[in-house]
Design a protein with these regions (language model features):
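Extended, helix-rich structural scaffolds rather than catalytic motifs
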Residues: 23-27
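Short active-site neighborhood of thiol/selenol oxidoreductases, capturing the structured segment around
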Residues: 29-58, 74-76
């Protein structure tokens, strides 16, 4: 039952649940504060092999870099766990253009705002934070953005 309830959250076509995050500088932000046409929410753990592969795939996707440059896409990378020293150690692996934050209050995990059964997880959201793609691989996100004629 709990599994099903979690799967019901943040479905495609629904508004993604808001949460707050903290940057390495201590500055705070929230998902809903992102102003770009698209927000790519990337929930990940430092040092996880699949996370590193996803970072590389996103870094090497021309459409993603182009939209980042045009300020039409925000990549919001969020660390949902407690090991902040570990997170800080890996910060330099993320592109500077991304917003790299952590969930200081562990709300994502404790309130089960997002399904974290698989890490990393990617959500593509539109300007209104409606979920366009959920749990999608980087390639699917790239193809979606290209298909939308966002070149």
């Amino acid at each position: 039952k709990a599994r099903r309830e979690l799967a019901q959250k943040n479905r495609i076509g629904t508004k993604a649940l808001n949460f707050n995050y903290t940057l390495a500088s201590g500055a705070q932000g929230s998902l809903y504060q992102q102003k770009s046409d698209y927000t790519l929410l990337f929930i990940n753990n430092p040092g996880c092999h699949a996370c590193t592969e996803t970072i590389e795939a996103l870094k090497n996707a021309p459409i993603i870099n182009q939209l980042l440059e045009q300020k039409r896409l925000t990549v919001l990378s969020i660390y949902p766990d407690e090991e902040l020293d570990e997170w800080r150690k890996h910060l330099n692996e993320f592109p500077k253009e991304w917003v790299n934050g952590y969930d200081k209050t562990f709300a994502i995990k404790e309130q089960q705002l997002y399904d974290l059964k698989a890490i990393p997880t990617l959500y593509l959201l539109n300007k209104d934070k409606t979920v366009l793609l959920k749990d999608a691989p980087a390639q699917t996100i790239e193809e979606y953005l290209l298909m939308k004629g966002e070149q």
